[in-house]
C-alpha cells in the first residue's frame, strides 16, 4: 500500500508508437481517458504531453510499468522507466510507477463490453489502459515513487 497523493494526476500507458493518457483525481475517485499521443519524434511527443500538463496542471504522474505475468521484467520495463524519468526531468513532478500487467486486458474487456471496435477501438485502447493504470493506483496498488533522485 502507498499513500495516495492529493490533486490531479496524469497517467500514462507508454508504448513506442502510442502513449495513452488518462486524467484523474484520487480525492474524487474519478479517472477518465484523455488522449493518445502518437507518432513523431520524442520532442514532438513531449510537446503534446506539455500541452496536457499545461491544461490539466497535474501534481504528479503515474506511469504503467510493464512486467510479465510472473512479475519478471518485460522488454518495455526499461523504456517505461526511462519515460518516467524524462517526465520528471521535464516537468519536475513526482512519478509513480505501477504494475500495469492487466491494464490492456482490462481495457480490451471494457471496450468489448461497450461494443467499441475497429478504428475507434484502436484510437482509445491506450487511453483506457492508462485509465486502468490510474484506477489501480487510486485503489492503493503497489507503487514506486521517483522524484528526481535515484536511490
From Swiss-Prot:
Task: Tell me one GO molecular function of this protein.
Answer: nuclease activity
Among the GO biological process terms of this entry, one is: rRNA 5'-end processing
Q: Report the EC number(s), separated by commas if there are several.
A: 3.1.-.-
The record's listing under Pfam families reads: RuvX (PF03652)
Where is it mostly found? cytoplasm
Q: According to its UniProt record, where is this protein located?
A: Cytoplasm
What does UniProt give as GO cellular component? cytosol
Q: Keywords on this record?
A: Cytoplasm, Hydrolase, Nuclease, Ribosome biogenesis
Q: Which family does it belong to?
A: Belongs to the YqgF nuclease family.
Q: Any idea what job this protein has?
A: Could be a nuclease involved in processing of the 5'-end of pre-16S rRNA.
Full protein name: Putative pre-16S rRNA nuclease
Amino acid at each position: 500500500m502507498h499513500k495516495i497523493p492529493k490533486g490531479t494526476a496524469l497517467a500514462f500507458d507508454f508504448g513506442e508508437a502510442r502513449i495513452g493518457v488518462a486524467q484523474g483525481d484520487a480525492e474524487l475517485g474519478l479517472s477518465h481517458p484523455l488522449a493518445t499521443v502518437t507518432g513523431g519524434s520524442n520532442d514532438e511527443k513531449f510537446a503534446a504531453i506539455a500541452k496536457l500538463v499545461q491544461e490539466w496542471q497535474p501534481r504528479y504522474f503515474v506511469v504503467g510499468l510493464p512486467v510479465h505475468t510472473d512479475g519478471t521484467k518485460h522488454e518495455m520495463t526499461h523504456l517505461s522507466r526511462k519515460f518516467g524519468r524524462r517526465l520528471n526531468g521535464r516537468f519536475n513532478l513526482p512519478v509513480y510507477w505501477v504494475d500495469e500487467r492487466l491494464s490492456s486486458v482490462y481495457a480490451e474487456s471494457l471496450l468489448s463490453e461497450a461494443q467499441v471496435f475497429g478504428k475507434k477501438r484502436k484510437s482509445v485502447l491506450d487511453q483506457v489502459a492508462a485509465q486502468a493504470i490510474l484506477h489501480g493506483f487510486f485503489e492503493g496498488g503497489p507503487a514506486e515513487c521517483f522524484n528526481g533522485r535515484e536511490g
